[in-house]
Amino acid sequence: MGSTLFKTIALIGKHKNPDIMTPLLNLAEYLTDRGTSVVLDDLTAAHIGKNQYPVVALEEIGRQADLAIVLGGDGTMLNIARTLVPFSVPLIGINQGRLGFLTDLTVDTMYATLNDMLAGQFIVENRMLLTTEVTRHGESVFKELAFNDVVLHRGISSGMIELEVHINGEYVYSLRSDGLIIATPTGSTAYALSSGGPILHPGLNLMILVPVCPHTLSNRPIVIGADAVIEIKIHYTTETKIYTDSHSWFDLGEHDRVLVRRCPETIKLLHPVHHSYYRMLREKLGWSSILQKNSR
């Protein structure tokens, strides 16, 4: 039995994924043997079936747990992070998805790594979020948090959307395109990356605006400070929607205004001491794989 800095640890699994049951229960037993209290969120508990661990609503985890360990992919981490951000509960991610930009650990090696992390050997990284609000005729009609990005997209309509972008009250440009992405450094490796945006190190206090298939090729991605306030005015739309982390969405109408700004709270991620952001990029994006294969 080892020592741990965390007295109560919440375990949260990717819902409706049959592969998480065994590793999650094994992890719960491992933590219990270390003298840690383990709680499960209600959706995870419902998926894995009857067990001896206390079950609480996801919102209650923030009030009860000192740490949350998430088994799943980046989507699971995004959802949990948005819920727990008001409580400053640190997160550790164990990858059960595909790429896993946010989930450092693997199921095969998690125990050796957790031994060190639970004893205090970890790196703390604070990641920014965005708040977005839609106003219509002066009234707020939609408000949500985003860890990755806020996306305005034309949806299934064949026509482009037309909008104006203002930053800190100053007109910047007009845009005719399939959409616009406003991303955090965390979200720079998601939809923004596939749309031609730059990769931002997560330690930077920046945001990026990335047009999606702009009609004018001079509409390029731009990088702005994290303290900027972005206002988007919708001029023409048919079926345009706004998405936050591909999770929540809302139908936009002409003359709606979208405000995007930095959230005052941050997400606290815990990494192993040997964590390297650049090594993670090499592994996830396959950088230099051909050179390594053909090197002499």
From Swiss-Prot:
GO terms for biological process: NAD metabolic process; NADP biosynthetic process. The keyword Signal does not apply. Coiled coil: none annotated. Its EC number is 2.7.1.23. GO terms for cellular component: cytoplasm. It is an enzyme of class 2 (transferase). It catalyses: NAD(+) + ATP = ADP + NADP(+) + H(+). Signal peptide: none annotated. Its cofactor is a divalent metal cation. The active site is at 74 (proton acceptor). Keywords: ATP-binding, Cytoplasm, Kinase, NAD, NADP, Nucleotide-binding, Transferase. GO terms for molecular function: ATP binding; metal ion binding; NAD binding; NAD+ kinase activity. InterPro entries: ATP-NAD_kinase_N, ATP-NAD_kinase_PpnK-typ_C, NAD/diacylglycerol_kinase_sf, NADK. It holds the Pfam family NAD_kinase. Involved in the regulation of the intracellular balance of NAD and NADP, and is a key enzyme in the biosynthesis of NADP. Catalyzes specifically the phosphorylation on 2'-hydroxyl of the adenosine moiety of NAD to yield NADP. Belongs to the NAD kinase family. This is NAD kinase. It comes from Nitrosomonas eutropha (strain DSM 101675 / C91 / Nm57). The lineage of its organism: Bacteria, Pseudomonadati, Pseudomonadota, Betaproteobacteria, Nitrosomonadales. The gene is nadK.
